[in-house]
Amino acid sequence: MGCRTSKVLPEPPGDVQLDLVKKVEPHQTDVYKNFIKYDGGGEKTGSPSPQGQSQAVAKVSQSPPPANDQPEPADSHRKKVAKYRAKFDPRVTAKYDIKALIGRGSFSRVVRVEHRSTRQPYAIKMIETRYREGREVCESELCVLRRVRHTNIIQLMEVFETAERVYMVMELATGGELFDRIITRGSFTERDATRVLQMVLDGVKYLHTLGITHRDLKPENLLYYHPGADSKIMITDFGLASTRKKGDECLMKTTCGTPEYIAPEILVRKPYTNAVDMWALGVISYILLSGTMPFEDDNRMRLYRQILKGKYSFSGEPWPSVSNLAKDFIDRVLTVDPNERLSAGQALKHPWIVSMAASSSMKNLHRSISQNLLKRASSRCHSTKSSQSTRSSRSTKSSKARRLREKELRELNRRYQQQCNG
């Protein structure tokens, strides 16, 4: 959901170099430990980052204050905000005016800020690097974001470091998550779907060219830049990303991802390539056209077996109204064999994407898609098994529920090997 009062950052100029990203030497004293819980701005991060890391790209929603809290006096609120700002590293507050706490996690806080000179809004993500997992996430994100410059990938603007914390100044996305936008729209056609996928595929192709594999592509990590109808989509949250010199040729082994979006080759612990991102995009494409998941089961082992078989259906609404070309696109990315799966470059050349569904029906699929999305969201609200990354969650409880459990994967791999050996 968008923030009507937020300014919109201009598109980054093509000639801006990566020297925008600079390192500030560690400060000798570390100044703050506590944060106010609610700043009244009604904002939260667009998606979780690994191990509870709040993402630096903000999704803005109309969340009310905690139900049990009475509105506090204005003077008391101002004092609390002033005290909160005073705890920030002085080099940060000298340059940025802290406006609101918009996200939090086990090892991070995210605040909405304004540049004091330009008045441009940004998000600052603070990561506690004294913890091992915090350091790992920070290193992963910085390794990627310092290298990339693409219109469909969130941009890192500046970095401040202290002995125990890192502050990443990033673009602020105010347009909300991909599927939130679809639900609020009155219309959604196949052509609209191809516009979204073109932008995401452009970003993924760019990442893969640099040898970067995201490894956690999902709707929560695809944010709209601003609330306008012409907003671009941006890929965010690189806490699980892997960086290699040549992404297609280098094999990865780490078991990570979000269960419903994870590729079969990861589940059976085979060395894998950046083709895992394309599998996740296949899942996203399926949801984009139907509002439902191709693979879903509350029982994790049954879910994994579905993924390994790669069997899904095009039954139920609105699939009868979806073109065969769109279904062919999904079939070619949701291919169990990664060698047969379309690459990002090949996917961009698929007739359905190239023609922007020109030969498809322009029937409005919005009603069925939004109803299915809302139905799924409602059912997930009553379960702790929300779609969180293996190293991320909005709460400890949901994190444990959604983690790729080592015991389950060992059992799955044992059964898979038994089947292969006959």
From Swiss-Prot:
InterPro entries: Kinase-like_dom_sf (IPR011009), Prot_kinase_dom (IPR000719), Protein_kinase_ATP_BS (IPR017441), Ser/Thr_kinase_AS (IPR008271). Disulfide bonds: none annotated. Coiled coil: none annotated. Residues 46-62 have a biased composition (Polar residues). Keywords: ATP-binding, Kinase, Nucleotide-binding, Serine/threonine-protein kinase, Transferase. Its EC number is 2.7.11.1. The active site is at D216 (proton acceptor). Residues 405-414 have a biased composition (Basic and acidic residues). Gene3D superfamilies: Transferase(Phosphotransferase) domain 1. Residues 35-80, 376-422 are annotated as: Disordered. Residues 384-396 have a biased composition (Low complexity). It catalyses: L-seryl-[protein] + ATP = O-phospho-L-seryl-[protein] + ADP + H(+); L-threonyl-[protein] + ATP = O-phospho-L-threonyl-[protein] + ADP + H(+). Residues 96-353 form the Protein kinase domain. It is an enzyme of class 2 (transferase). ATP binds at I102, G103, R104, G105, S106, F107, S108, R109, V110, K125. The keyword Transcription regulation does not apply. GO terms for molecular function: ATP binding; protein serine kinase activity; protein serine/threonine kinase activity. GO terms for cellular component: cytoplasm. Pfam families: Pkinase. Belongs to the protein kinase superfamily. CAMK Ser/Thr protein kinase family. This is Serine/threonine-protein kinase H1 homolog. It comes from Danio rerio (Zebrafish).
